[in-house]
């Protein structure tokens, strides 16, 4: 007789291995594309070290706000949704997704508006680099779209749809790499701080493209996912929000501390050069 005791585990093991491979490929592709476009724009006439300085300084503030708003979202949502789907509680899974979307859309809106309105004061008083205000203003809208994308990525991860999540990362980075080079070339002849703002506006456009891809992917697959019960969604909003934040905040704190350290280093170096 053939021993079939381990047979049911094989599809799961194969699926897990495929998911890990997809994530690894996506991460490698993102890193390579990111490295290539930074090398290219640094060597574009007029950008150089000055433009790179504005680009990097503004990006540190952006990374800090992303750490506050979105770093812990995918893992927290994926964990909660996977727990619900494992119990076939699809209504509960949809409820978590909707609650998370409301929370982080709100957080993203507030932080995007704050960064846009306070771009110049942050550049002057925090970074000690006045020209970086253009970069911060260009990056501001992307925080909202990153928050939205993070919720969708958590949903797809929790429902074991890793192809969508990995594809979205590669698509976003491909747009960012290509558009950054195109936008910087379009700004040749302008001041380095303006060229830097053009470069970072490509990040905003890329995050919009990534969010749109994830939204369409969700809508296309939504019909295959059992609908949530309407009753109780509003009543359970705050308990569900508390669960999401309890998981997301501790993960975000580590990234926040790291981002603050990098921002302090950047400000210290800038002040030393002055």
What function would you assign to each model-found segment?
Residues 42-64, 192, 196-200, 242-247, ...:
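Interfacial/gating helices of multi-pass transporter permease domains
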Residues 35-52, 123-125, 187, 192, ...:
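Helix-terminus/linker motif at the lipid-water interface of multi-pass membrane proteins
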Residues 56-80, 141-144:
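Small-residue-rich midsections of specific transmembrane alpha-helices
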Residues 1-36, 91, 95, 232-254:
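N-terminal membrane topogenesis motif
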């Amino acid at each position: 007789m053939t021993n079939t005791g381990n047979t049911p585990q094989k599809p799961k093991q194969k699926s897990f291995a495929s998911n890990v491979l997809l994530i690894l490929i996506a991460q490698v592709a993102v890193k390579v594309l990111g490295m290539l476009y930074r090398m290219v724009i640094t060597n574009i006439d007029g950008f150089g070290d000055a433009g790179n300085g504005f680009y990097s300084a503004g990006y540190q503030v952006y990374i800090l706000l992303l750490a506050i708003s979105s770093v812990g979202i995918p893992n927290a949502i994926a964990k909660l949704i996977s727990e619900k789907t494992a119990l076939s509680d699809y209504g509960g899974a949809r409820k978590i997704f909707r609650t998370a979307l409301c929370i982080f859309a709100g957080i993203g809106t507030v932080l995007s508006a704050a960064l846009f309105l306070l771009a110049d004061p942050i550049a002057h008083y925090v970074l000690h680099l006045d020209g970086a205000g253009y970069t911060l203003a260009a990056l501001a809208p992307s925080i909202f779209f990153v928050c939205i994308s993070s919720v969708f990525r958590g949903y797809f991860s929790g429902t074991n749809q890793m192809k969508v999540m990995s594809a979205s990362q590669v698509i976003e980075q491909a747009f960012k790499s290509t558009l950054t080079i195109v936008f910087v070339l379009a700004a040749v002849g302008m001041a380095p701080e303006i060229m830097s703002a053009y470069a970072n506006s490509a990040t905003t456009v890329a995050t919009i493209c990534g969010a749109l891809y994830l939204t369409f992917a969700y809508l296309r697959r939504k019909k295959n996912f059992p609908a949530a019960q309407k009753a109780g969604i509003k009543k359970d909003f705050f308990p569900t929000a508390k669960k999401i934040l309890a998981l997301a905040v501790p993960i975000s704190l580590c990234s926040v501390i790291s981002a603050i350290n990098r921002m302090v280093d950047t400000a210290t170096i800038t002040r030393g050069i002055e």
